[in-house]
UniProtKB/Swiss-Prot annotation:
HAMAP family: Ribosomal_uL3_B (MF_01325_B). Gene3D superfamilies: 3.30.160.810, Translation factors. GO terms for biological process: translation. InterPro entries: Ribosomal_uL3, Ribosomal_uL3_bac/org-type, Ribosomal_uL3_CS, Transl_B-barrel_sf. Methylated by PrmB. The keyword Lipid metabolism does not apply. GO terms for molecular function: rRNA binding; structural constituent of ribosome. This is Large ribosomal subunit protein uL3. The modification N5-methylglutamine is found at Q153. Part of the 50S ribosomal subunit. Forms a cluster with proteins L14 and L19. The gene is rplC.
Amino acid sequence: MAIGLIGRKVGMTRIFTEDGTSIPVTVIEIAGNRVTQVKTLETDGYRALQVTTGTKKANRITKAEAGHFAKGGVEAGRGLWEMRLADGEGEGIEVGAEINVDIFADTVKVDVTGQSKGKGFQGGVKRWNFRTQDMTHGNSLAHRSNGSIGQNQTPGRVFKGKKMSGHMGAEQVTTQNLHVVRVDAERNLLLVRGAVPGATNGDLIIKPAVKA
C-alpha cells in the first residue's frame, strides 16, 4: 500500500479553467503528518507507519498517549493513524519525520476514506432503496413497510445480513479515483474533483489511487 496522509475536510467550492469550465472541488487541509512510530517485520510482524496530525489539549491526553508521543519526541496530535507499507516503501522515514502534502505533487488520482454522515435509524426505503407499496388499492398501513423477511418453518429463521430497518450512515466509506486538481503546498491544501465522504471538519485518509 502506498503512503497516505491524514487530512481535514474544509468544504466544497469550484474553480474555473482557462476556457471558463467550472470544476467542483473539495478542499482538504493536510497539515504536516508527524511520524510517531515505524513498525517493522522484526518487531511487529509487518511494516507500517504510524502518524499523527493537528494538536490536542494537554488535559485531554491520557498518560499512555503522553508517554507514546514523548517516546517519539513528537507533539501530541488529535489522533493516531496507521498505514501499511509494501516492500521498499517508506525507506528512510524515521520517527519524528514530517510528511507534507507535497508528496502528492506528481499524483494524478487519489482514494479518499472518511466516515459518512450519520442519518440515524432509517427504514428500508431510505436505507436500502426499497420500492414502496401501493398508496391505495386497499393498502392503508404498509406503504413503506419492508414486506416479508423470510419463509415459514423452513428455514424457520431470518438469514444474517437481511436488509432491514436500522442505523444508517456513520460508517467508513472510500471514494476512489478522485482527480487531483491542485496541490497548494504553501497553504497545506489539496483540491480534488468531486465530493468526499463525511461532514465538514471530518478526518480523511488520502492515498494514491489503487486502480488508477
